[in-house]
Amino acid sequence: MEQPWPPPGPWSFPRTGGETEEESDLDVSPSSSHYSPVPDGGAQMYSHGIELACQRQKEFVKSSVACKWNLAEAQQKLGSLALHNSESLDQEHAKAQTAVSELRQREEEWRQKEEALVQRERTCLWNVDAISKDVFNKSFINQDKRKTEDEDKSQSFMQKYEQKIRHFGMLSRWDDSQRFLSDHPYLVCEETAKYLILWCFHLEAEQKGALMEQIAHQAVVMQFIMEMAKNCNVDPRGCFRLFFQKAKAEEEGYFEAFKNELEAFKARVRLYAQSQSFAPVTVENHAPHSGVGCIGSAEPLPQNPDSLQCCPPAPLCSVDSVVHKEDDDRMMDTV
């Protein structure tokens, strides 16, 4: 049977048997009074554009984290060698210094790329015509089979474990996060990081800055764990405890790299949300959730905030099933 295009994303996951969610005032599902459909073509084009932007952001976070983590590793190694005064270590010390210099150069290159990305987003708001051309020039018939299968697996994973991922995103303490991942090690994967990153965009579009910062913290945590596993050439599920050990000890280099990447990521999310493409949408212009990154219409914002209707449906933006409202202040602690 033919699958719909684009495939459903985490913002439109169907509830399985017996699973219920309290109706939220942000509910824009077809059964809601706020629902007002628009032509499928426009929704698909816009969803595709948002997905491209979010994917670009995820790749940037991944590369930036890799650079910062490798630099922290090299600095720690250099520091440990400095404690020894043996001449036999001179050669290794020189190699470590060279590695630090190279990594600092790479870090500077990524800093320049980040500045270029920020400048481009400030000067180039969403171009619907460009999105349209990209969509209609792309062949959906001859897609690479492996890529399609990977996307299907990713969507299936996020659909199956959506509630668990959201729960992890709301945790605010290192010990709580480590304990939760110990109980649910299958969540230590790229799909969890992707879901949390996309959630950050939606929360910032809703002007829920404090909650966005909490979810951003957990998104960067997951990305750092994945990078550590890559560097150690081990399964991420087997090394996440090492990350929390370093984080709780606030080891020099590692913790600083984490904080810097977290602040940089939050700044990029805010910048994206300020563009028309990630603005909250009016009820009249709201589009059905046809893709992972669909946030809504690219129409200019009205001046009256009462007329705005934010896009994420109740299953995503309603967190009362995970944490009670009176715990909001506690949840905002990021350490």
Curated annotation (Swiss-Prot):
Gene3D superfamilies: Cdc37, Hsp90 binding domain. Residues 84-120 form a coiled coil. Residues 27-40 have a biased composition (Low complexity). Residues 2-170 are annotated as: Self-association. The modification Phosphoserine is found at S32, S88. Co-chaperone that binds to numerous proteins and promotes their interaction with Hsp70 and Hsp90. Self-associates. Forms complexes with Hsp70 and Hsp90. Interacts with CDC37, FKBP4, PPID and STIP1. This is Hsp90 co-chaperone Cdc37-like 1. It comes from Rattus norvegicus (Rat).
